[in-house]
Swiss-Prot record:
Region (Disordered): 116-186
Keyword Nucleus carried by entry: yes
Expression triggers: By IL11.
Protein name, entry field: PRKR-interacting protein 1
Record organism: Mus musculus
Subcellular location: Nucleus; Nucleus, Nucleolus
Biased composition, class Basic residues, residue ranges: 126-143
GO terms under biological process: mRNA processing; renal system process; RNA splicing
Keyword annotations from UniProtKB, A to Z: Coiled coil, mRNA processing, mRNA splicing, Nucleus, Spliceosome
Length: 186
């Protein structure tokens, strides 16, 4: 047996920090706990699961010898061989049907995806055009405002032009106006 002195020579084991028990209430908390555990020891390799291969049936045999019918007359073992071959063939056909259906659904999904993408692009183009139109309108209004400021800065030239044009405009307005008579009741 080991002496008590030999046991005391060994250094004491480092104590682990007590961890509080945390029960995640939702998926976000569970993910947070997993991330915290991973980040405690960043040197440790992270286990990344590989994608599981889909099950596929065994390829059919290239050559089947002495195929008997389903009757057991040829021998008691022949029926079991036939039954297993038939089961595998049915499995293979079901698998091929399922794969064809899956490919069909995938193709339909891709078509819908393309259709939605085109519709979204059309909508985006329409909105982009509208934004551009508004932007141009604002720029045009800004230019008009700047032109008006410039005209106000040069009042002598502008006032003469406005005076002559306003006289002509008032004369045409007077000629165009007809007396309006409103007769109320009898």
């Amino acid at each position: 047996m080991a002496s008590p002195a030999a046991a005391s020579v060994r250094p004491p084991r480092p104590k682990k920090e007590p961890q509080t028990l945390v029960i995640p209430k939702n998926a976000a908390e569970e993910q947070k706990l997993k991330l915290e555990r991973l980040m405690k020891n960043p040197d440790k390799a992270v286990p990344i699961p590989e994608k599981m291969n889909e099950w596929a049936p065994r390829a059919p045999p290239e050559f089947v010898r002495d195929v008997m019918g389903s009757s057991a007359g040829a021998g008691s073992g022949e029926f079991h061989v036939y039954r297993h071959l038939r089961r595998r063939e049915y499995q293979r056909q079901d698998y091929m049907d399922a794969m064809a259906e899956k490919q069909k659904l995938d193709a339909e999904f891709q078509k819908r995806l393309e259709k939605n993408k085109i519709a979204a692009e059309e909508q985006t183009a329409k909105r982009r055009k509208k934004r551009q139109k508004l932007k141009e309108k604002k720029l045009l209004a800004k230019k008009m405002k700047l032109e008006q400021k410039k005209q106000k800065e040069e009042p002598s030239q502008c006032q003469e032009q406005h005076a002559s044009s306003s006289d002509e405009a008032s004369e045409t307005e007077e000629e165009e106006e007809e007396p309006s008579v409103v007769i109320m009741g009898r």
